[in-house]
Amino acid sequence: MLLLAAAGWWVDAPYVLAVPVAALLAYWAFARLDLYMGVVLALVPLSINLGELGLTSVGWYMPTEPMLFALLLLSCARWLSGKRLDRTLWKHPVTWVILAGFVWMGLTILPSSHPVVSLKAWISRAWFMVAFYFLLAAWFEHSPKAQTRFLALLLVPICVVVTYTIVRHAGHGFGKGAGHWVMKPFFKDHTSYGAVLAMLLPPAIAMVWRKHKTALARVLWGLGVVWLSVGTVLSYTRAAWVSLAAVGALWAVMKLGVRLKPLLAASVVALGGLALSWDALVVQLERNNQDSSDNFTQHIESISNVSTDDSNLERLNRWSCALAMFEERPFWGWGPGTYQFEYAPFQTSTLRTRISTNNADLGNAHSEYLGPLAEQGILGLLAVLGLLAATLH
């Protein structure tokens, strides 16, 4: 392999350098799946969508999605040859909910408004499910240190992306406008970037305080926490900030010893009170005219502005479209991955904003619940809620 790499460098053919790397990855996929998965995890934050850069018509994130697709084919071949996963994993409620949701997602391809798009979304879901649920679960079960390695393999490249983003952002004075795109090409926009940072921050904090850690390990994890925190703040992603506040509140409730059933009961009561006072709440929200801003205090205040803030109003527009789409196709939905192609006719003039579009190029329903409801019908929503319930239980 070293000779092949040297030959590629000598004849000025850089693509030849990839051959020994591909050969090594292929060997690991068959003989050392843990090393192969480690490479995939480390490359996830660094992957680039070549389609968005105009370099290819295929909208895959390179190089991870081709690697995941290869892993899907290899795993299917292994299972067909008789190799089975651990029975305890198959019997786990989360596994059953995930598989039920996956089967239903496949069935909704048949009446989809865009069958090819839905089929691609379903196959994509398959390789994520196989790699990041079944194979990771098996890795975690057989290796006591796998969880720590998993987080470290994600945290290090994420910190590289945060550094890249902050350096670019600094060149634009850390303004809110630039904060929406300086993370490209690694992330599509600031919302996905902020969401990933927010999801990694709590487990990274937990690793700092985990027992039996050396002083050096605590310092390194602590530096990672600081860098993730800086990146989250500078992402100007209000949803990430609110989510972290909610996670902190939930952690405090758990530390106080409150069990799940009383917590769910309190949530139901709170939702009931919200429904009864909805009109008064809307009146109060409409009095908030603070738009999103470079000022962090004003940016936080703008979270509840549903009268003038385009970002918040567009979110309401997307939710309204998702509900209208569900009303038209309540059982089957419009098909996986089709929301962005179908929602435009469901927009109303009262909810359209300056950033609304009919071009099917600006994202999804902005809801992990309403999106499946519109695309996969009522059973799609129940699959998401079932996964949430099984995970919490």
Roles of regions detected by a PLM:
Residues 305-320, 328, 332-376:
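Long extracytoplasmic/lumenal interhelical loops at the membrane interface
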Residues 48-55, 111, 174-186, 355-370:
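Juxtamembrane membrane-water interface segments that cap and precede transmembrane helices
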Residues 11-15, 57-67, 120-126, 185-199, ...:
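Membrane-interface micro-motifs in multi-pass membrane enzymes
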Residues 27-124:
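N-terminal hydrophobic segments of proteins, predominantly signal-anchor/transmembrane helices
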Residues 10-20, 34-39, 59-64, 217-218, ...:
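Short, aromatic-rich membrane-interface segments at the entry and exit
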Residues 10-16, 56, 60, 86, ...:
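Membrane-interfacial loop-to-transmembrane-helix junctions in polytopic alpha-helical membrane proteins
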Residues 1-2, 6-7, 22-28, 72, ...:
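Alpha-helical transmembrane segments of multi-pass inner-membrane proteins
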Residues 177-186, 276-321, 327, 356-360:
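Flexible juxtamembrane loops connecting transmembrane helices in multi-pass membrane enzymes
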